[in-house]
Amino acid sequence: MAPRQQPRRIARELALLSLSQIKGKAEKLDKVELNDLTLAAIRALTSEVQDTLETASAEVKRGHNQLFQYETKATTLESAKTMIKDALTLTQEAINRLANAIEFPEIIQLASQYEVREYAIELIGTINRRRKEIDEQLEAVLKDWQLKRLAKIDQDILRLAVAEILFLDVPEKVSINEAVELAKRYSDDDGYRFINGVLRRFTDHIKHN
């Protein structure tokens, strides 16, 4: 059985995964049901699983071809082993995403569905309405990076946190901690450290400006 979680934590995850698929003005968002959000989140996860497995498959093929063509070259053997290792890592990531997709409906059923839907819609609506302001705030604190060059999931985790802090009166510490947890679940190995660093700079920035 999936563990019981706080409604707002589930809502953040639901909003994160649904952002790319749920668009529209406030009046349209009001008509979006919890099932619509859940379906959008599961579609996003399964699409990511498919993309990750395709990448892993390509790495396996490349590694196999190198082994087949250059069996006696030590450097090529090492390169092929690295490709296979990378493919295994990607496959594990895909399995984790698939597990998330499978357990997500049960997690929502165990929570207060009204609270989950209301906060997820509030987050999505706030980001849609204030996207320009949110992105400008993030661009101001991204050192040697451009927001658009970050992984899409990292962009959206950052937007969620900034939206909460600037517009939804969520305490900075709470929002940053929740963003870090989302990054641990959905970003790459170093993603959560990067997210934490950017958001710390953001909170310092707004205090001094």
Swiss-Prot record:
InterPro entries cross-referenced by the UniProt entry: NusB-like_sf (IPR035926), NusB_fam (IPR011605), NusB_RsmB_TIM44 (IPR006027)
Top-level taxon: Bacteria
Ribosomal protein as UniProt keyword: no
Keywords: RNA-binding, Transcription, Transcription antitermination, Transcription regulation
GO CC terms of this entry: cytosol
GO term, biological process aspect, one: DNA-templated transcription termination
GO terms of molecular function: RNA binding
Pfam families associated with the record: NusB
Sequence similarity: Belongs to the NusB family.
Function: Involved in transcription antitermination. Required for transcription of ribosomal RNA (rRNA) genes. Binds specifically to the boxA antiterminator sequence of the ribosomal RNA (rrn) operons.
Protein name in UniProt: Transcription antitermination protein NusB
Gene: nusB
